[in-house]
């Protein structure tokens, strides 16, 4: 077990990437670290379970564990598979001249954070003893899928087709993560906007 090995060799800090998926579809926004997770996907449940292991190791053995709940990360060379890559999926389809498919009415929101901001959060946290426990790594800004489409139309200069289909079971309607705790404890503020 990695946590046992870290404890035995006295690792000073263990940082684990987690996900906004641990929250599920909670009605309160912004989502804060203190909220109890109600994952609506196996991915979110797996991340929440791993967070539980880290909490127990911190409490039982004093291992400084940090969980970063990443918002929807985007950036260069991102794969366009899976549910988290809507920006890269839309980008590829637009470049290929294909229509976009939106599940639901397009008013669902996500907190999109640029990959370089995520890297910056990790760097700021490493070795910082005041950084312990769970943190959201986010912009605290909700952007709807329809807003993304409007931005893609402006950038591409094309009026591509968009098809709306029924929302998928388990999809989260709104997600916006508070970044107050990360700013307070280790000075992290995302600087990149979708513009």
What are these regions (language model features)?
Residues 49, 53, 57, 90, ...:
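Hydrophobic alpha-helix immediately C-terminal to the catalytic Tyr-X-X-X-Lys motif of short-chain
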Residues 38, 80, 111-114:
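Residues at the N-terminus of a long alpha-helix
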Residues 2, 54, 90, 182-183:
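Structural element of the ATP-grasp superfamily
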Residues 1-73, 188:
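N-terminal Rossmann-like NAD(P)+-binding domain of SDR-like oxidoreductases, especially those catalyzing
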Residues 19-25, 72-78, 107, 127, ...:
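Active-site proximal helix/loop that lines the substrate pocket
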Residues 92-195:
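C-terminal substrate-binding subdomain of Rossmann-fold SDR/epimerase-dehydratase oxidoreductases
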Residues 19, 27, 83-86, 90, ...:
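Activation loop
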């Amino acid at each position: 077990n990695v946590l046992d090995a870290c404890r035995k060799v006295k690792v000073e800090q263990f940082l684990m990437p987690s996900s906004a998926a641990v929250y599920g579809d909670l009605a309160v926004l912004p989502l804060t670290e203190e909220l109890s997770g109600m994952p609506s996907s196996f991915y979110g449940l797996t991340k929440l379970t791993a967070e539980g292991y880290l909490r127990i190791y911190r409490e039982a053995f004093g291992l400084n564990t940090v969980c970063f709940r990443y918002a929807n990360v985007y950036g260069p060379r991102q794969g366009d598979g899976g549910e988290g890559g809507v920006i890269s999926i839309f980008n590829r389809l637009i470049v290929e001249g294909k229509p976009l498919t939106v599940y639901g009415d397009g008013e669902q929101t996500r907190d999109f954070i640029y990959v370089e901001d995520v890297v910056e959060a990790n760097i700021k946290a490493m070795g910082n003893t005041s950084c312990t426990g769970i943190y959201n790594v986010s912009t605290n800004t909700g952007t709807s899928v329809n807003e993304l489409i409007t931005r893609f139309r402006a950038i591409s200069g094309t009026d591509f087709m968009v098809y709306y289909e029924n929302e998928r079971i388990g999809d989260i309607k709104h997600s916006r993560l508070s970044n107050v705790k990360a700013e307070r404890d280790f000075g992290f503020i995302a600087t990149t906007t979708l513009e």
